[in-house]
Amino acid sequence: MVWGFGNVVNNFANQGLTVVFSWIFMIALYFVPYALMVGELGSAFKDSQGGVSAWIRSTTTPMLAFMAGWTYWVVHVPYLAQKPQALLIALSWAISPSGQLAGVLKELNPLILQSMVLVVFLVFLYVSTKGVKVLKVIGNIAGMSMFVMSLLYIVLGLAAPAITGHVATPDITVKSFVPKFDFAYLTTLSMLVFAVGGCEKISPYVNNTKNPSKNFPKGMLVLAGMVAVCALLGSIAMGMMFNANAIPEDLMMNGQYYAFQLLGDHYGLGSLFVIVYALANTAAQLSALVFSIDAPLKVLLGDADAKFIPKALSKTNKNGVLVNGYIMTAILVSTLIVVPALGIGNTNELFNWLLKLNSVVMPMRYLWVFLAYMGLKKLSNKFKTEYKFIKNDKLGFLVGLWCFGFTAFACIMGMFPTDVAAFSPEWIFRVSLNVLTPLVLMGIGLILPVISKITNSNEELSKKN
């Protein structure tokens, strides 16, 4: 799914009502060209099953193609470190819709919470080796339920003030929607990029469209319109229900549940909305956790090139489980679960930091889409495509470069926290983690081909002897 209610809540928590302007900017100047580039790439490489790494292989070099594939896997490491947190929070609201249990979680010592998170992760790491197919069905149903609940919130949230006569944010004017373009604002851009990314998953469908040169861009523009409506109206609904001038400090952690709790209160339905949403989110988080462990690993290692990935990592047991791949996942994710708890003050700040880290790391994979598009424009005579986003190759290259540069800029700015004093010990600790995490994760990818070369040479020598 390209969109979720959490995107509205998290960005409202970052920017308040000024996020309305940001959404308009992002969708018009980033999401729409991004989606249409994906359409052209999907059309140009319609026979390719390898996704972004195949696009990169066709337009650049095999090594860069490997790094693209590695990036698509490794960005899931912070995601997997954060998912058990989200699962525990969703479960706490499902069990205690008053928020009492969620309050207990929020006050826990970060080391205690992260120990629980580590146990949950390791349990589901084991579960994912069993290939629980029913979870995918449950996850799809839960995801659809959450989407419907999100639309319901927008409609009922906008209507609530007409019933109660009360708007939480006082004196809303045009100025309420215009951000202050300072350093703090620039650090929030990565969360917006994180929210609208991922539409490259739609690329295979461009060739299933009748008259793709006309109908696919129309479909993408409809998708962009739907995202825009959800983002804009959802943000305004949040401003109706929450005071944008006094945003709760734990809105990222608990905001989705506060929103449905308030909605139930406004309509006299008690905890009904929050229970339904929490149950759906629990199932969705559980399913996402299991499948985000297994599926990306199979994509990376299932058809691995021995030039770039050591054969040992592709080793499977009798049940077809990528044993060493799972061990690598366990080590990387467990490290990212435990280490931050040693230097971040409280659980709410830890949750917010990990979510923001995802907004820095996850968009790194979008860079490869834009690089592939620039490569396609450089080699346009080599590839035939039924659909072209921009017919002028030089202009198309510049648009790809704009999206690439903006994504990189947003990721870099997202590394700097604004909720702690600059250059304080905790600020330095967080910035260090934000910088080192992507560097280490990408660095491992650069080291693997070297290890592969050495191990392959050793294998050949042992065979000769």
Predicted regions and their residues:
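Membrane-water interface regions at transmembrane-helix termini and the short interhelical loops
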Residues: 10, 43, 67, 119-142, ...
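Helix-loop-helix junctions that connect adjacent transmembrane segments
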Residues: 20-21, 104-112, 140-275, 422-424
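Hydrophobic transmembrane alpha-helices that form the core helical bundles
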Residues: 33-40, 44, 48-117, 126, ...
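TM-loop-TM module centered on a large, flexible mid-protein loop between adjacent transmembrane helices
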Residues: 54-55, 61, 225-290, 309-358
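Transmembrane alpha-helical segments of multi-pass small-molecule transport proteins
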Residues: 95-131, 147-155, 192, 196, ...
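Membrane-interface loop-to-helix entry segments
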Residues: 114-163, 197, 220-225, 355, ...
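C-terminal membrane-solvent junction of multi-pass transporters and transport-like membrane proteins
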Residues: 316-317, 366-416, 429-430
